[in-house]
C-alpha cells in the first residue's frame, strides 16, 4: 500500500489510533520515528520537539497528559467574586447604552417644541444616532477581534462619554444632529461588553449571567425616566444629557481593573498572558487552577467577514441579521410610539386615536406632562419582568424557541391596539409588548456570542448589532412620521415584522442550549485526518477493485 509522508514542524509527534485517540510509547520516543494508523493506512511521521513552555495545540495533545483549554479552566474555576465584579463593570457600560437610547424618546418632544422642529427633523434626530451606531458596529467588532475586547470596549466608551457631554452644549439643531451622530458611533461598540463578559462565564451559568447584564439595561432605562422627571422641569434637557453620562464616567474610572479575554489572548498567541489572567480569576474566586499545559485550538485567521458566510454559518448569519433588525426596529419603535400615544391622550377607537395623534404630532406641540412621564415609567419598568421571564424560559425552551415566543407575543399585543382601548388598557398592552420584545433582545444577546467561534465572535456580534441599528434607523420614520398618516398601517408593520422574525428564529440551524463556547470553526485536526485517511483508504480499495 502506498505510504504518504507528512512533515510536522514544531508539533509533538503522537500515534493516532483508529478511533481517533492518541497514544505515545517509550519505543516511539526512543526511535524518533512514529506511525499514524488510520483504517490500515500507515503514514510515517518525523518527530520534532516543542520549545520549552510552548503551548500544545489541542489537536496534537496527548489525552493522557495533564492539559487543559481556556474553556476547561473557566469551567473548573466557576462563577465567583471575579464574575460578580465583571458583571457590575460591564453592566455600567450597558446601563449607559440604555440611557443614551431612552433619552431619545424624551429629547425628541422637548426639542420639537423648544426649537419648533417639524416631525421629519425630530425623526432625523433619532435616526442619526442609529446611523452612527450602524456605521461603527462592524468596525468595533473588527477592532475587538484584532486588538482585544478590552481595547475596543474602552475606546468606544470614552468616545461616547466625550461626545455625549459635548452634545449638551449644542447651540443649534445642526450641531446637536452631528454630535448625537458621533455619540451613536461610540455606542456601536458597547455591545462588545457582552462578548468580553461571555468569554469569562462557565457554560451552565452563561445564559443567566448574560441576562444579568440585561438587568443593567432595564435599570438604565428606568433611571433615565426618573432622572428626566426631576431634571427636565427645573434644569432642562442640557443637564439631562450631562447627567446621563455618569455611568460612562464611572466605567472610564474603573476600567483599569478590566482584564483582557483569555480566549482572545490564546488566539493571539499570548498564552502566558492568558494563564496569568486565569490564575487571577482562580485566586479571586478561591478556586483551584487546572494543572498541566494550556492547549490551543487550531490557529486560524481572525475577524474576517467571509468567515461569517462559510457553509456552516451562512444561514445562521443571514437569519440572525434579520432577527436583530426586527428586534431593534420593533423595540425602539415601541419606545417612540409610547410617548406619541400617551401624548394623544385617553382615546377609544382607532379613528379617534389617529386624529388625536395627528393633532399632537403637528407643529402645535405639547411638552410631556407629569402623567406622560409616569406612564412612560410604568412601561419602562416592564424591562424587569421581561428579564425574569426570559431567564426562566431560555434554558427550558432553548434560545430559538424563546426568541420566537417573544416575537409572537409582541405581535399579538400590537394587533390588540387595533381595538377600542382606554389609556389604562393601552398602558398594560404597551407594558406586555415591551416586556417581551426586550426579552427577545436578551435572548438574541445570549444566542449570538454562543453560536460563533472565538475567532469571529466579536465580528459576528458586531455585524448583528449593525443590522439592529439599521432597524433602529428606519423606525423613527414609522413611529413618528407614518403614525401621522395611519395608525393601522404603523401597527401592522411592527406586528408583521415580528411574525417574520419569529419564523426566522425557528429556522435557525443551530441551537446553542447546553453547548460550550466554540474555540474554532473547524473540526478537530485529528478528526479531519481520520476522515481523510478513511476516504483515502476507500479510494485505494476502489482502485484495487477496478484493477482486478
UniProtKB/Swiss-Prot annotation:
GO CC terms of this entry: basal plasma membrane; synaptic vesicle membrane
GO biological process: xenobiotic transport
Subcellular location(s) per record: Cytoplasmic vesicle, Secretory vesicle, Synaptic vesicle membrane
GO molecular function, one term: transmembrane transporter activity
Membrane among keywords: yes
Stretches of the chain found on the membrane's Vesicular side: 109-122, 178-180, 231-238, 338-373, 423-424, 479-489
Post-translational modification Phosphoserine, affected residues: 25, 31, 542
Ranges that cross the membrane: 88-108, 123-143, 157-177, 181-201, 210-230, 239-259, 317-337, 374-394, 402-422, 425-445, 458-478, 490-510
PROSITE patterns in the record: MFS
Keywords: Cytoplasmic vesicle, Membrane, Phosphoprotein, Synapse, Transmembrane, Transmembrane helix, Transport
InterPro entries linked to this entry: MFS (IPR011701), MFS_dom (IPR020846), MFS_sugar_transport-like (IPR005828), MFS_trans_sf (IPR036259), Orgcat_transp/SVOP (IPR004749), SVOP-like_MFS_dom (IPR047969)
Membrane-topology annotation of the record: Multi-pass membrane protein
Cytoplasmic side: 1-87, 144-156, 202-209, 260-316, 395-401, 446-457, 511-548
Pfam family name, one: Sugar_tr
Family, as annotated: Belongs to the major facilitator superfamily.
PANTHER family to which the protein is assigned, alphabetical: MAJOR FACILITATOR-TYPE TRANSPORTER HXNZ-RELATED, SYNAPTIC VESICLE GLYCOPROTEIN 2
Protein name: Synaptic vesicle 2-related protein
Organism: Pongo abelii (Sumatran orangutan)
Amino acid at each position: 500500500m502506498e505510504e504518504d509522508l507528512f512533515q510536522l514542524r514544531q508539533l509533538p509527534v503522537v500515534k493516532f489510533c483508529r478511533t481517533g485517540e492518541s497514544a505515545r510509547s517509550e519505543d516511539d520516543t526512543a526511535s524518533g520515528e512514529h506511525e499514524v494508523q488510520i483504517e490500515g493506512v500507515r503514514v510515517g511521521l518525523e518527530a520534532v520537539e516543542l520549545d520549552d513552555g510552548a503551548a500544545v495545540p489541542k489537536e496534537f495533545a496527548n489525552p493522557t497528559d495533564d492539559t487543559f483549554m481556556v474553556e476547561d479552566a473557566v469551567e473548573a474555576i466557576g462563577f465567583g467574586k471575579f464574575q460578580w465584579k465583571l458583571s457590575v463593570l460591564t453592566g455600567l457600560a450597558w446601563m449607559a447604552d440604555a440611557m443614551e437610547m431612552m433619552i431619545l424618546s424624551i429629547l425628541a418632544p422637548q426639542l420639537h417644541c423648544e426649537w419648533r422642529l417639524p416631525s421629519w427633523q425630530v425623526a432625523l434626530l433619532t435616526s442619526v444616532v442609529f446611523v452612527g451606531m450602524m456605521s461603527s458596529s462592524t468596525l468595533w467588532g473588527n477592532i475587538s477581534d484584532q486588538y482585544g475586547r478590552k481595547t475596543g470596549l474602552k475606546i468606544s466608551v470614552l468616545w461616547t462619554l466625550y461626545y455625549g457631554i459635548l452634545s449638551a452644549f449644542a447651540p443649534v439643531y445642526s450641531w446637536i444632529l452631528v454630535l448625537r451622530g458621533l455619540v451613536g458611533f461610540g455606542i456601536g461598540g458597547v455591545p462588545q461588553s457582552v462578548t468580553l463578559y461571555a468569554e469569562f462565564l462557565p457554560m451552565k451559568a452563561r445564559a443567566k449571567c448574560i441576562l444579568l447584564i440585561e438587568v443593567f439595561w432595564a435599570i438604565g432605562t428606568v433611571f433615565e425616566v426618573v432622572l428626566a422627571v426631576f431634571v427636565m422641569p427645573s434644569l432642562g434637557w442640557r443637564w439631562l444629557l450631562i447627567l446621563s453620562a455618569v455611568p460612562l464616567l464611572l466605567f472610564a474610572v474603573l476600567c483599569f481593573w478590566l482584564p483582557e479575554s483569555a480566549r482572545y489572548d490564546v488566539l493571539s498567541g499570548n498564552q502566558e498572558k492568558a494563564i496569568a489572567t486565569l490564575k487571577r480569576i482562580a485566586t479571586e474566586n478561591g478556586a483551584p487552577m487546572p494543572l498541566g499545559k494550556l492547549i490551543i485550538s487550531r490557529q486560524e485567521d481572525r475577524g474576517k467577514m467571509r468567515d461569517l458566510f462559510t457553509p456552516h454559518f451562512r444561514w445562521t448569519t443571514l437569519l440572525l441579521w434579520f432577527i436583530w433588525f426586527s428586534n431593534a426596529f420593533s423595540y425602539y419603535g415601541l419606545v417612540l410610539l409610547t410617548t406619541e400615544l400617551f401624548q394623544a391622550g385617553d382615546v377609544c377607537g382607532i379613528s379617534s386615536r389617529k386624529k388625536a395623534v395627528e393633532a399632537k404630532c403637528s407643529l402645535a406641540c405639547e411638552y410631556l406632562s407629569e402623567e406622560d412621564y409616569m406612564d412612560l415609567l410604568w412601561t419602562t419598568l416592564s424591562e424587569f419582568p421581561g428579564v425574569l421571564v426570559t431567564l426562566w424560559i431560555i434554558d427550558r425552551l432553548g434560545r430559538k424557541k424563546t426568541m420566537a415566543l417573544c416575537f409572537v407575543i409582541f405581535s399579538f399585543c400590537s394587533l390588540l391596539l387595533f381595538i377600542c382601548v382606554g389609556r389604562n388598557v393601552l398602558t398594560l398592552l404597551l407594558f406586555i409588548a415591551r416586556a417581551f420584545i426586550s426579552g427577545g433582545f436578551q435572548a438574541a444577546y445570549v444566542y449570538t456570542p454562543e453560536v460563533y467561534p472565538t475567532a469571529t465572535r466579536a465580528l459576528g456580534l458586531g455585524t448583528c448589532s449593525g443590522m439592529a441599528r439599521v432597524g433602529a434607523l428606519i423606525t423613527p420614520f414609522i413611529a413618528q412620521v407614518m403614525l401621522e398618516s395611519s395608525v393601522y398601517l404603523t401597527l401592522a408593520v411592527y406586528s408583521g415584522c415580528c411574525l417574520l422574525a419569529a419564523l426566522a428564529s425557528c429556522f435557525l440551524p443551530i441551537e446553542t442550549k447546553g453547548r460550550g463556547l466554540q474555540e474554532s470553526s473547524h473540526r478537530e485536526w485529528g478528526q479531519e485526518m481520520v476522515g481523510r485517511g478513511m476516504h483515502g483508504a476507500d479510494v485505494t480499495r476502489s482502485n484495487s477493485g477496478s484493477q482486478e
